[in-house]
Amino acid sequence: MKYQLTALEARVIGCLLEKQVTTPEQYPLSVNGVVTACNQKTNREPVMNLSESEVQEQLDNLVKRHYLRTVSGFGNRVTKYEQRFCNSEFGDLKLSAAEVALITTLLLRGAQTPGELRSRAARMYEFSDMAELESTLEQLANREDGPFVVRLAREPGKRESRYMHLFSGEVEDQPAVTDMSNAVDGDLQARVEALEIEVAELKQRLDSLLAHLGD
């Protein structure tokens, strides 16, 4: 497969895809914006603490690989970045809004069940029902230019199998060690996390508005 993203590259691209949809008024993102998005505590697994220099290195690499492009001029005081990973004018990878939402959520959080994906991707795309979501996953798994996702073996204590993206190469399908977290209902946990994400984004928008009013 031609896509071989490192964990940090996947995080950066996932953040840009997410913010392009959820906070379009703040997109494209500056380096500081990408750092904040990468280190966000909601809707991220694992939570990272990347420095500006670490993020800048990833941005430079992704620009060289034509997955991102810089935006400057026309009133922009700082260089900003936008994704060319998918749905760009000259790019080969074309994804529907539903596919973008699922791929983004998998890039940001790793392997997840369909129920978890539906709750966590809701800020980007509202699936009408589980059948639509599962159909979208199957399309991503069977695309001629893919596959882009794979279904993993069901973990102990879980009712659903998880799915994982394939933009970082093949996935080792090894069940995780059973622990107390397996007793937590995945759907309920995902709903709580989705609410936390919404609150965090509303706070971010409010802070941005207050900053503009203070200028």
From Swiss-Prot:
The modification N6-acetyllysine is found at residue 80. Gene3D superfamilies: Winged helix-like DNA-binding domain superfamily/Winged helix DNA-binding domain. Keywords: Acetylation. Coiled coil: none annotated. It holds the Pfam family DUF480. InterPro entries: DUF480, WH-like_DNA-bd_sf, WH_DNA-bd_sf. Belongs to the UPF0502 family. HAMAP family: UPF0502. This is UPF0502 protein YceH. The lineage of its organism: Bacteria, Pseudomonadati, Pseudomonadota, Gammaproteobacteria, Enterobacterales.
